[in-house]
Amino acid sequence: METWTFASASIIVKVLISILVIFSVIILITRISGLRTFAKMSSFDFASTIAIGSILASVVLNTNQSLLKGSIALGGIVLFQTFFSYVTRKSKRLDSLFTNSPVMLMYEGKILYENLDKTNVGEDDLIAKLRESNALKFSEVRAVILESTGDMSVLHSSETTELDAKVLQGVKGIPDYVNL
């Protein structure tokens, strides 16, 4: 009998077998499709990873769920993700439609408050990211970029090294006074 805190031995065995099978399927799919399957390169990749996790949890925890159906669903999501990534790579128009552009949040030690507002990022979050990246002074920060994945990249140096224009390619919200 299954209760809130206990489950029968047969249920536990089914869950353990489900874990073994579905994780084997995940490993096989990842080996076939490549590591990009779980890379957070775009918001679509992030959504795909969440969907994969949701399917995985459903199959493992719901003992009435078919392992074959779960495996097909996982394969389908990865296949669609691969197709979607290929199509957006080939078409700049589709890429710009479905992918967020990175946004400059800080440049040469100055916080770009207008861009913080546009991206709904708080100054405290920005400062926390600076600490996390071991930036010691605002003057050492060359740029902070909110990437299309939602991650923040902090480019800092104690030298007066100029940023290569290629590093800032595709970044929105670069101040007008910056000559790249």
Pin down the residues of each PLM region.
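Structural signature of multi-pass, alpha-helical inner-membrane proteins
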Residues: 169-180
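Canonical alpha-helical transmembrane segment with a positive-inside/aromatic-interface signature
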Residues: 67-146, 152-171
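Short flexible/disordered coil segments
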Residues: 23-33, 146-149, 153, 172-173
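Membrane-targeting alpha-helical segments
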Residues: 1-94
